Amino acid sequence: MNSLAVQLHQLFNAQKRFTFPFEANKNEIPTNGIYIIFEKGETFNGCDRIIRVGTHTGDNQLYSRLKQHFVKENKNRSIFRKNIGRSLLRKDDPHHPYAEKWEYDTTSREGKQKYAHLLDVNFEKALEKRISEYIQQNLSFVVFEVKTKDDRLFWESRIISTLSNAAKAGEIKPSENWLGSYSPNEKIRESGLWLVNELYKQSLNDEEFEKLKNLVKGK
């Protein structure tokens, strides 16, 4: 029998896939749920390999969260975008002179006062554009409805842990050319996931996977 990591990939590879632009498909994206992202060139056991799992905490925010990742050019609102930017910088130059400034967060008033004058706005805009192009050209996703915050966080954690534990055991491996291999974050490099939270916790068991299957299929 296939491992749960394989079964997870088979389950999500069989669902309706969305790519950018997805505005026309807004009515097919549940208001509350979990997204599963795939990346071109990444495969596992004959399937497209899952490279990120995510959700939202506020009510009715799934579509908005996807837009923050795919469209809105502001890495301070999307750690996913920030991590892709980190990898692009280090792919360009392992000791990129702008890498430290890319970490600055100017979302708060304090952050603006402390860091805004240090930033190269044109460089950041150009990098944000590169991030958007990378995401829009290379990533696709599936979604499934999970109505409550607690359930979303539970299933997100179980799925991430199942995948990362399989990576830790050597079952899942990123391709040699995976952009995440340039990440300064060891967790991203080792897990093969654009994630640093919920890694290596409790994996799904068989009973939970059956429940998840029904949830994904809308039963």
Question: Where are each of the predicted segments found?
Answer:
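GIY-YIG nuclease catalytic motif and its immediate N-terminal context
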Residues: 1-130, 134-219
